[in-house]
């Protein structure tokens, strides 16, 4: 235990927590415009063509965002909503596009986990 005199001379340092999603600036989501929509390949043990897009956010940041689900309607100049959440096998991809918001349509014919892919409840 440090004495009061020691603490006066050298105070306890606060732990600085670094954000995993700095471009969001402590917001839950941010809006942006797609500057490039393309596919990329994942890291070593995995193999696929992952759909990603480069997004210029309203705060000026340019980030890479993953497009989840099967099939999408995004192209250059599409307005999308970005949330945090990295993709483990894609280096540098720390954001996800929100399906079913703004210009990004929900996943077609999705029956399970619909809320994650912006799909309304089907008519029974």
From Swiss-Prot:
This is Small ribosomal subunit protein uS12. It comes from the Bacteria. GO terms for molecular function: rRNA binding; structural constituent of ribosome; tRNA binding. Part of the 30S ribosomal subunit. Contacts proteins S8 and S17. May interact with IF1 in the 30S initiation complex. InterPro entries: NA-bd_OB-fold, Ribosomal_uS12, Ribosomal_uS12_bac. It comes from Aeromonas hydrophila subsp. hydrophila (strain ATCC 7966 / DSM 30187 / BCRC 13018 / CCUG 14551 / JCM 1027 / KCTC 2358 / NCIMB 9240 / NCTC 8049). The modification 3-methylthioaspartic acid is found at residue 89. With S4 and S5 plays an important role in translational accuracy. Interacts with and stabilizes bases of the 16S rRNA that are involved in tRNA selection in the A site and with the mRNA backbone. Located at the interface of the 30S and 50S subunits, it traverses the body of the 30S subunit contacting proteins on the other side and probably holding the rRNA structure together. The combined cluster of proteins S8, S12 and S17 appears to hold together the shoulder and platform of the 30S subunit. GO terms for cellular component: small ribosomal subunit. Keywords: Methylation, Ribonucleoprotein, Ribosomal protein, RNA-binding, rRNA-binding, tRNA-binding. Belongs to the universal ribosomal protein uS12 family. One of its GO terms (biological process) is translation.
């Amino acid at each position: 235990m440090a004495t009061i005199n020691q603490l006066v001379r050298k105070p306890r340092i606060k732990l600085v927590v670094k954000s995993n999603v700095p471009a969001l600036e402590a917001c839950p989501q941010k809006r942006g415009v797609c500057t490039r929509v393309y596919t990329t390949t994942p890291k070593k043990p995995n193999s696929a063509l992952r759909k990603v897009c480069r997004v210029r956010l309203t705060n000026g940041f340019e980030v890479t965002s993953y497009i989840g689900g099967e099939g999408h309607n995004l192209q250059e100049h599409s307005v999308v909503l970005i949330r945090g959440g990295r993709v483990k096998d894609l280096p540098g991809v720390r954001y996800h596009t929100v399906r079913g918001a703004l210009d990004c349509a929900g996943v077609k014919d999705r029956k399970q986990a619909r809320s994650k892919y912006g799909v309304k409840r089907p008519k029974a």
